[in-house]
């Protein structure tokens, strides 16, 4: 199904300065919507005609209200903004809580006060997944208990999603009408120009850190191309309307490309496309999990003095090494979502166009240095973190 047009509607996108928020804004703009991007940082790209940027902090209710004041009537809010998805951000619990929970509360309050009829929330697989194997799961699965989440980002996204879905059907503070809400739970996002995960991966490749893979080679995870994700959000917004029977009201939807794949095999075209050798060494998942735990503990101790980028966190080990994928049946049936096929070729070309790829003389000596560091870290994890009574539940 082609995503619908939005003639003369004004939409507001929180997190509109980020990769996905900006792409969603451009997609909506091309369909005739007037778009307001609300974020603490401005997009790196030039704003197309019909798109307006409002600078503000989602944690500040006054900033949120200012964003809404820039439009006579907002027809739909796409609440994309979040914090703490990966890397060292994942260890900043205070800011994660303030943005993901407090920011969501501010958005819901503004929607009810301003009479916004529709809200689409960008959630995550992680509200359900916390390290357990899930094969072809669906939306009937219960939320993972909050105390079982291995990271605060996933915990707060779960809290925020519940708040959004519980707000479905609430009456506006003034006048007639109610707020209708739904949640999109995406897989890992990729696409040319993605600025959160792919540059970090390429950095590891270029520095010689990608020297091994881990976990079961048969483990499967999922990804979603940015354009498929934008399409799903637009369809979800339409499915909150009366002419669609409000079918999406109060509902969550898993969204991916619909092609479960081994995490490391997914990135093989990127590694080899940039001229590097895909690693043949495979390490146990438990060993890498213990290493990630040590890295997190080290960051906890020295992070205030040296806020280094963790090589991996425990959640990232789970997300990359443990099978978890979900059915698209509900999204297809209720939203009309049909993912388009994509691969990593455009991503490879983007990185090449921006000066990446193997070719520097002396790189092998750098690889040897990082090999030594990695071996030392792995040996340290074995010698200092032996817990015979502890088992990793996957």
Swiss-Prot record:
Q: Give the matching Pfam families.
A: 3Beta_HSD (PF01073)
Q: What is its EC number?
A: 1.1.1.-
**Record's bilayer topology term:** Multi-pass membrane protein
Molecular functions per Gene Ontology: oxidoreductase activity, acting on the CH-OH group of donors, NAD or NADP as acceptor
Q: Where is the active site?
A: 153 (proton acceptor)
State the GO CC annotations: membrane
Q: Which superkingdom does the taxonomy of this entry point to?
A: Eukaryota
Keyword match Lipoprotein: no
Q: Give the signal peptide range.
A: none
Q: Which residues cross the membrane?
A: 283-303, 367-387
Q: Which UniProt keywords apply?
A: Membrane, NAD, Oxidoreductase, Transmembrane, Transmembrane helix
Q: In terms of one coarse class, where is the protein primarily found?
A: membrane
Matching InterPro entries, A to Z?
Answer: 3Beta_OHSteriod_DH/Estase, Lipid_A_modif_metabolic_enz, NAD(P)-bd_dom_sf
| Enzymatic class | oxidoreductase
GO BP annotations of the record are: steroid biosynthetic process
Q: Which SUPFAM superfamilies match?
A: NAD(P)-binding Rossmann-fold domains (SSF51735)
Query: Where is it localised?
Result: Membrane
Q: Which Gene3D superfamilies match?
A: NAD(P)-binding Rossmann-like Domain
* Residues annotated for NAD(+) binding in this entry: 157
Protein family per UniProt: Belongs to the 3-beta-HSD family.
Protein name, as recorded: Short-chain dehydrogenase/reductase family 42E member 1
Q: Which organism is it from?
A: Mus musculus (Mouse)
What gene name does this entry carry? Sdr42e1
């Amino acid at each position: 199904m082609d995503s619908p047009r939005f003639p003369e509607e004004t939409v507001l996108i929180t997190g509109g300065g980020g990769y996905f928020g900006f792409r969603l804004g451009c997609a909506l703009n091309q369909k005739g919507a007037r778009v307001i991007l609300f974020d603490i940082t401005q997009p790196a790209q030039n704003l197309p005609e019909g798109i307006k940027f409002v600078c503000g902090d989602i944690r500040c209710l006054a900033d949120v209200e200012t964003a809404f004041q820039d439009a006579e009537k907002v027809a739909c809010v796409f609440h994309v903004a979040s914090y703490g998805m990966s890397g060292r951000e994942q260890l900043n619990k205070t800011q994660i809580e303030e943005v993901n929970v407090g920011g969501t509360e501010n958005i819901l309050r503004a929607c009810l006060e301003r009479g916004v009829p529709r809200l689409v929330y960008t959630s995550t697989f992680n509200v359900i997944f916390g390290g357990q194997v899930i094969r072809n799961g669906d939306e009937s699965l219960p939320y993972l208990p909050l105390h079982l989440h291995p990271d605060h980002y996933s915990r707060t996204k779960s809290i925020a999603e519940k708040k959004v879905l519980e707000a479905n059907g609430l009456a506006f503070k003034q006048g007639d009408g109610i707020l209708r809400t739904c949640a999109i739970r995406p897989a890992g996002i990729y696409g040319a120009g993605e600025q959160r995960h792919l540059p970090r991966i390429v950095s590891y490749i270029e520095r010689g850190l990608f020297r091994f893979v881990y976990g079961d080679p048969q483990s499967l995870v999922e990804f979603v191309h940015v354009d498929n994700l934008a399409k799903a959000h637009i369809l979800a917004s339409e499915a909150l309307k009366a002419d669609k029977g409000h079918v999406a009201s109060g509902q969550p939807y898993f969204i991916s490309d619909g092609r479960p794949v081994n995490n490391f095999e997914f990135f093989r075209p990127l590694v080899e496309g940039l001229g590097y050798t895909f690693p043949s060494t495979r390490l146990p998942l438990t060993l890498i999990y213990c290493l990630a735990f040590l890295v997190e503990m080290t960051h906890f101790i020295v992070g205030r003095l040296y806020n280094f980028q963790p090589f991996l966190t425990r959640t990232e080990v789970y997300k990359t090494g443990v099978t978890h994928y979900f059915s698209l049946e509900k999204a297809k049936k209720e939203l009309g979502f049909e993912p388009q096929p994509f691969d990593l070729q455009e991503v490879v070309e983007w990185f090449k166009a921006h000066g990446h790829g193997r070719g520097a003389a002396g790189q092998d000596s750098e690889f040897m240095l990082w090999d030594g560091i990695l071996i030392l870290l792995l040996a340290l994890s074995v010698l200092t973190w032996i817990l015979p009574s502890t088992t990793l539940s996957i």
